[in-house]
């Protein structure tokens, strides 16, 4: 991952040294269980814990073995010395790699979940602040009816909350490891030893395993991340729309000294939201790769491995960066209430059309006849007052209450309850 989009915690989790340290943790925990079960002599796990395997050592050994896990095991055994034959006893590479991956993905999800929770708090705070701010709603990019800005933000909040729930479920789905050997049939290691070892690591056993932890588990994680990224893309796209010159209702924060363009000094571009939209495309592509990784031959092949070395750390770095970026935008975005009110006024003759239609229908006028008349008159009259007067004259009906503030917009009394 390029430095521009790195998250410090995620980068640490997925750096090679931490990966090798996690492999060592799995080996140490496994040997500890062998000791407790009387299979291995006591003290070997302590020796494993006391030594370190440096990334550079693995790189150098891999030049000979062409296998990173085998290189790691060679170095670890050499450093432990007597009793090291119990290291990797009865295991295959995927037992260590996949169990470690589950630990690292879980840890990454915990980082992401905290960031998403912070984002939710910011959205909720802004929604509460703007719960009574009227704004013109738009469907298909066209004026529709008035709504509350707080409702729009509340809609975003609940969507992100559903994403939080999906990520939590995915965390449970990925909390599985395996120590059942080359094809998952416990040739050497017993199910009891596997269960006890994985329990110490806060993982569960993959039942009916092949050589690997099933990749549908990975696909669920990256599908959840992809949905989250797409939710961010939707929010970012709307923020970009609000910042259009002809709308100018909501603006991203613009720092002192910032330049919006190298050529045009007047420019204040929504670069943060645009960045989120761009990065979401990468995340969605990676989720497709994770689905492709489900399709492996028989008990496994390694066509998934090269893909995962890229998409796992990159996905977590990018989605955490996106979350932090969107949190900052939401927290600091500038809401132009004056322009919001101007746009409301400009849209008034259109935003009342359904209310006028309902009044006419309630007074016994044929719905289609009323609809066609309103449709025609709206395009002939530029203001709400002119429209109402024309309709009153055509249908001999009193519409004086249509533009009363109490009738202009729906009920918002239960606003705070909707966050629960």
Q: What function would you assign to each model-found segment?
A:
Residues 1, 76-93, 189-208, 289, ...:
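Acidic, low-complexity proline/glycine-rich segments
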Residues 1-26, 36-39, 46, 50, ...:
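Glycine-rich cofactor/substrate-binding loops
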Residues 18-29, 114-117, 121, 226, ...:
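Alpha-helical bundle segments that constitute or directly flank the non-heme di-iron/ferroxidase center
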Residues 43-56, 88-99, 253-258:
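A short glycine/small-residue-enriched secondary-structure motif
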Residues 55-80:
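N-terminal low-complexity, intrinsically disordered segments
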Residues 89-134:
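Hydrophobic alpha-helical hairpins/lids featuring a short glycine-rich hinge
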Residues 101-114, 128, 142-296, 303-304, ...:
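Charged, flexible cofactor/metal-binding loops and thiol motifs
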């Amino acid at each position: 991952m390029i430095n521009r989009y790195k998250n410090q915690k995620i980068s640490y989790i997925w750096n090679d040294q931490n990966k090798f340290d996690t492999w060592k943790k799995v080996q140490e925990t496994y040997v500890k269980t062998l000791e407790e079960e009387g299979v291995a002599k006591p003290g070997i796990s302590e020796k494993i814990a006391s030594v370190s395997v440096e990334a550079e050592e693995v790189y150098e050994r891999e030049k000979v073995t062409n296998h990173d896990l085998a290189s790691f095991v060679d170095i670890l055994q050499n450093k432990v010395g007597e009793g090291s034959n119990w290291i990797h006893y009865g295991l295959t590479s995927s037992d260590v790699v996949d169990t470690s991956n589950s630990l690292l993905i879980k840890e990454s999800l915990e980082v992401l979940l905290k960031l998403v929770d912070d984002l939710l708090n910011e959205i909720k705070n802004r929604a509460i602040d703007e719960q009574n701010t009227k704004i013109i709603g738009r469907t298909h990019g066209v004026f529709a009816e008035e709504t509350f800005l707080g409702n729009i933000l509340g809609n975003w909040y609940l969507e992100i909350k559903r994403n939080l729930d999906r990520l939590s479920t995915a965390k449970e789905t990925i909390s599985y490891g395996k120590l059942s050997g080359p094809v998952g049939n416990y040739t050497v290691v017993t199910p009891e030893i596997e269960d006890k070892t994985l329990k110490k690591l806060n993982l569960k056993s993959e039942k009916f395993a092949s050589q690997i932890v099933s990749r549908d588990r990975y696909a669920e994680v990256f599908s959840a991340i992809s949905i989250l990224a797409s939710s961010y893309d939707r929010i970012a796209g709307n923020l970009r729309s609000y910042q259009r010159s002809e709308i100018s209702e909501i603006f991203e924060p613009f720092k002192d000294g910032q330049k919006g363009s190298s050529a045009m000094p007047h420019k204040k571009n929504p670069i943060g939201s645009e960045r989120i939209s761009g990065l979401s495309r990468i995340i969605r592509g990676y989720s497709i790769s994770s689905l492709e990784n489900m399709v492996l031959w028989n008990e496994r092949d390694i066509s998934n491995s090269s893909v995962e070395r890229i998409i796992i750390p990159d996905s977590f770095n990018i989605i955490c960066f996106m979350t932090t970026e969107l949190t900052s935008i939401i927290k600091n975005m500038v809401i132009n209430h004056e322009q919001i009110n101007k746009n409301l006024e400009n849209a008034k003759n259109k935003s009342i059309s359904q209310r006028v239609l309902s009044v006419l229908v309630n007074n016994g006028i044929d719905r289609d006849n009323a609809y066609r008349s309103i449709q025609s008159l709206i395009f002939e009259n530029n203001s709400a007052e002119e429209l109402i007067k024309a309709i009153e004259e055509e249908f001999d009906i009193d519409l004086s209450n249509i533009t009363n503030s109490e009738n202009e917009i729906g009920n918002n009394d239960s606003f705070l309850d909707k966050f629960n």
